[in-house]
Curated annotation (Swiss-Prot):
Residues 43-157 form the PX domain. SMART domains: PX. One of its GO terms (cellular component) is vacuolar membrane. It comes from Debaryomyces hansenii (strain ATCC 36239 / CBS 767 / BCRC 21394 / JCM 1990 / NBRC 0083 / IGC 2968). It is found in: Endosome membrane; Vacuole membrane. This is Endosomal/vacuolar adapter protein YPT35. The PX domain binds phosphatidylinositol 3-phosphate (PtdIns(3)P) which is necessary for peripheral membrane localization.
Amino acid sequence: MTASNRRGSTHRNSVTQLNKVLPVPIQLEDETSSGHFNSTSHITDVLVGDYHVIQGEGGSSYVVWSIRIIVDDSVYSSMVIYKRYSDIQRFREALLEHYPNTEIPPLPPKDNFSFQRLSMSDYWLENRRKGLQWFMTNVMLNPKHQHSPVITHFILN
């Protein structure tokens, strides 16, 4: 038997042996009824990133913030959501209602300046981003809130 015949024979035996291996059964789980992440999963990091100026109807503009949420310390288990400051305000109000005896950190103050003036101020927007980062970190990484329906609603809507 030549070397090439032996290699071909070995390869055929490997394929034949693989055909004898039974497939591992697939287990499907319905996660829709729980309304939130798997109970063993948890948010391990939250990063408030860049802001984006969106042109609204009638020429008005507003800012949305990108928020990356990392689950179980895996970059592959992360999502990016985009939220306006007013969305985050409503999120905080929902947390206060759902957890009346828990101290929820404040948001950075809402400024009364015009949007045109704010859009010129990178310094002001960076301070707002830092304040939002502090708020999101303190809320989303708090073990009391990890599986809160309020957080799930904020992330998924």
